[in-house]
Amino acid sequence: MFLTALLWRGRIPGRQWIGKHRRPRFVSLRAKQNMIRRLEIEAENHYWLSMPYMTREQERGHAAVRRREAFEAIKAAATSKFPPHRFIADQLDHLNVTKKWS
């Protein structure tokens, strides 16, 4: 009985990586270095993003002309797929051959 208790004593109950009594995962030196590097990159990104390239006045409407031209190009491409307009006067013009009163 004491031998069984001794052999089963150091075991983690259930799944060893999840749950209330899980095995603790120790942080390695490489994991610390990776975390420090990622935090430094994030701090640099925050620094560069905190200083805008353009002022609010410059930024407002700076792409309006380009967007309008792109929209006009899309609209022209869409309308070019349609056939030209056909009018009833042109379709029925052959019936006007025998008009006597004009």
UniProtKB/Swiss-Prot annotation:
GO cellular-component terms in the record? mitochondrial inner membrane; mitochondrial large ribosomal subunit; mitochondrial ribosome; mitochondrion
Recite the UniProt keywords alphabetically.
Mitochondrion, Ribonucleoprotein, Ribosomal protein
Q: Name one GO biological process term.
A: mitochondrial translation
Q: Which InterPro entries match?
A: Ribosomal_mL63 (IPR016576)
Q: Which Pfam families match?
A: MRP-63 (PF14978)
Q: Where found, per UniProt?
A: Mitochondrion
One Gene Ontology term of the molecular function aspect:
structural constituent of ribosome
Q: What is its main location?
A: mitochondrion
Q: Which domain of life is it from?
A: Eukaryota
Assembly with partners or alone? Component of the mitochondrial large ribosomal subunit (mt-LSU). Mature mammalian 55S mitochondrial ribosomes consist of a small (28S) and a large (39S) subunit. The 28S small subunit contains a 12S ribosomal RNA (12S mt-rRNA) and 30 different proteins. The 39S large subunit contains a 16S rRNA (16S mt-rRNA), a copy of mitochondrial valine transfer RNA (mt-tRNA(Val)), which plays an integral structural role, and 52 different proteins.
Q: Which PANTHER family is this protein grouped with?
A: LARGE RIBOSOMAL SUBUNIT PROTEIN ML63, MITOCHONDRIAL RIBOSOMAL PROTEIN 63
Q: Which family does it belong to?
A: Belongs to the mitochondrion-specific ribosomal protein mL63 family.
**Under which name does UniProt file this protein?**
Large ribosomal subunit protein mL63
Species this protein is from: Homo sapiens (Human)
